[in-house]
């Protein structure tokens, strides 16, 4: 069972709070691109410019779990669609990857940070919260939580050492810490590969539901290795105020699915925990926590899995394999979480088997959807409802130029020149082509040429290892060795060339931008730069002129080596950046 470490001065009060409440309530796919953790920083950042109880089922996708509660989000408004915020979400909460289930990356409730005060004179590093391992997942934030004998703004941080921390978001004071390791277990080894190194514990961004349980619940996936050499993947649900396991968790991840693909037996492909890692962020939608699985260092026979777990019970409620009669097709998206419009799920699948022979409905005849932009239906279980695959998808998979290195973004509803409301999503991967799909008719596969809403070529370079962000009619991309670029959305079409770009370029793995703003005003585009000396950057959203970077003042704001696939999290006047050994915190300087 997990071990709980609570600071002494808070322990008794925390237990009393919990007891009182109880009286009233019950990768692969990444291919060659997912490699070493840090690179040279470049010159751009200078002054210039144990098994769980029951609940796991196997099968071909039983009915999706019951239970109320929508998806979680940051509470931000103005995206033109439901943000999925829970009923109890506070103004500054950040409860899921990239702020909302559409994965727009925008926090529209930031009233402290503005373009006028984000500069080297008034803004900088205000703290560093040390933890016991790498922070690959985006930190999450809960405002005004009753915890540890008081009310705190709480930062939730997970590490590759299989630890979960609840920290006071302002001071960094530990409120509780819990380990996900069972007796005699360690985090997984990295199998001598640099994809996730040096240990693998909790890689993906968790998801929080404040309305579930006595104090709210954080859901996460942790990987471990036991003393006999066996690997485990488990879904956990922890009480926000105490860190104790709830919902009879954890649940051991196990699954099979009809098919004769990689690692199949007797007509079913089987999920082998040692072969997989949970890289992509979790999605909470309709009372179900969705997990998506990538290969563990591209070792062994693997396929593309999506699984759903009830947010009420942690029982497995849905299983889908998108390459059941083939191989590959893992889902990793450089850490981005699957996106949703509140009903369906959108994701980019990595290189793997794709059937160019289609059935009468235009679907791959053997059910293999490797290297494709997928729309998943959730009613009655998981199923591919629609998809788009490039006419060159097979060739791109063979060349490791797959789509799955990037994440999908659901755009707000937009109106075209004819007054028609369009429902769009977009994504790009290693081929640097921006694919904009109509969510109502994505285009499927056509060997003669792509049948797609819009396609923009030759404007990005280096491959996308992350995902874009959206704000005020602009979409921002940060691909490898490329400038951060803005494309403007007009009459439901993206500009065919960037309308603004930064002067600097971002080395591998590029950057996943995030946005802070107060509604449509005081917008700032934030981006983390990887490297031996990493950096946090802030840009004007219209011009992408640099407002600030953390290397401009010598060592004052520096925070050491970078982590790949890091997404800055901005809320309540602070910017939180995951690092190799903690979280760097930025805000307004005192005095």
Give, region by region, the residue ranges found by the protein language model:
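Inter-blade linker and blade-boundary elements of WD-repeat/beta-propeller domains
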Residues: 446-461, 497-503
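N-terminal secretory signal peptides that target proteins for export/translocation
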Residues: 1-9
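Blade-edge motifs of beta-propeller repeat domains
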Residues: 555-557
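Sec-dependent N-terminal signal peptides
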Residues: 9-19
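Membrane-interfacial loop- and helix-cap regions that link adjacent transmembrane helices
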Residues: 486-501
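Mobile, glycine-rich extracellular loop/lid and propeptide segments
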Residues: 90-415, 422-445, 457, 461-487, ...
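Ser/Thr-rich, Pro/Gly/Ala-heavy low-complexity intrinsically disordered linkers and tails
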Residues: 32-89
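C-terminal motif of bacterial Sec signal peptides marking the signal peptidase cleavage site
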Residues: 23-26
């Amino acid at each position: 069972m997990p071990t709980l470490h609570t600071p002494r001065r808070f322990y008794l009060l925390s237990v009393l709070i919990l007891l009182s409440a109880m009286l009233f309530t019950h990768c692969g796919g990444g291919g060659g691109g997912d490699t070493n953790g840090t690179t040279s920083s470049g010159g751009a950042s200078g002054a210039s410019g144990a098994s769980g109880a029951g609940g796991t089922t196997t099968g071909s996708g039983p009915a999706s779990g019951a239970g109320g509660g929508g998806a979680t989000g940051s509470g931000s408004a103005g995206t033109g669609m439901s943000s999925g915020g829970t009923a109890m979400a506070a103004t500054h909460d950040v409860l899921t990857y990239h702020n909302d289930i559409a994965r727009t990356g925008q926090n529209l409730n930031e009233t402290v940070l503005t373009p006028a005060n984000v500069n080297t004179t008034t803004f900088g590093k205000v703290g560093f919260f040390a933890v016991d391992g790498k922070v690959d997942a985006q930190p999450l934030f809960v405002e005004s939580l009753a915890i540890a004998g008081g009310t705190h703004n709480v930062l939730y941080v997970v590490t590759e050492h299989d630890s979960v921390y609840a920290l006071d978001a302002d001071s960094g004071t530990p409120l509780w810490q819990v380990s996900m390791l069972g007796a005699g277990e360690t985090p997984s080894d990295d199998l001598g590969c640099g994809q996730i190194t040096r240990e693998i514990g909790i890689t993906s961004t968790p998801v929080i539901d404040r309305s579930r349980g006595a104090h709210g619940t954080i859901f996460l996936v942790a990987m471990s290795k036991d003393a006999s050499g066996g690997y485990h993947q488990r879904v956990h649900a922890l009480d926000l105020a105490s860190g104790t396991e709830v919902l009879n968790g954890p649940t051991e991840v196990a699954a099979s699915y009809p098919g004769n693909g990689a690692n199949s037996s007797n007509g079913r492909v089987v999920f082998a925990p040692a072969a997989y890692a949970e890289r992509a962020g979790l999605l909470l939608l309709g009372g179900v926590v969705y997990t998506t699985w990538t290969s563990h260092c591209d070792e062994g026979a693997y396929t593309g899995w999506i699984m759903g777990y009830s947010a009420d019970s942690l029982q497995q409620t849905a299983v889908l394999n998108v390459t059941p009669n083939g191989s590959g097709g893992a889902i990793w998206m450089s850490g981005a979480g699957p996106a949703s419009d509140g009903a369906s799920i959108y994701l980019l699948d990595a290189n793997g088997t794709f059937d160019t022979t289609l059935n009468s409905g235009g679907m791959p005849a053997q059910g293999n959807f490797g290297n494709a932009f997928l729309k998943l239906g959730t009613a009655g279980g998981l199923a591919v409802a629609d998809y788009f695959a490039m006419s060159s998808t097979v060739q791109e998979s063979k060349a490791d130029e797959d789509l799955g290195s990037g994440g999908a973004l659901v755009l707000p509803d937009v109106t075209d020149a004819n007054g028609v409301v369009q429902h769009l999503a977009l994504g790009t991967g290693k081929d640097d082509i921006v694919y904009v799909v109509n969510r109502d008719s994505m285009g499927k596969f056509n060997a003669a040429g792509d049948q797609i809403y819009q396609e923009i070529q030759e404007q990005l370079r280096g491959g996308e290892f992350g995902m874009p962000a959206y704000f005020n009619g602009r979409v921002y991309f940060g691909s490898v060795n490329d400038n951060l670029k803005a494309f403007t959305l007009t009459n439901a079409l993206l500009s065919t060339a960037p309308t603004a770009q930064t002067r600097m370029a971002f080395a591998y793995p590029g950057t996943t931008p995030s946005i802070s703003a107060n509604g449509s005003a005081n917008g700032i585009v934030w981006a983390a730069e990887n490297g031996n000396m990493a950096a946090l950057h802030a840009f004007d959203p219209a011009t992408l002129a640099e407002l600030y970077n953390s290397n401009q003042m010598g060592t004052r704001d520096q925070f050491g080596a970078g982590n790949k696939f890091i997404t800055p999290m901005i809320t309540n006047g602070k910017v939180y950046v995951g690092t190799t050994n903690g979280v760097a915190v930025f805000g307004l300087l005192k005095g």
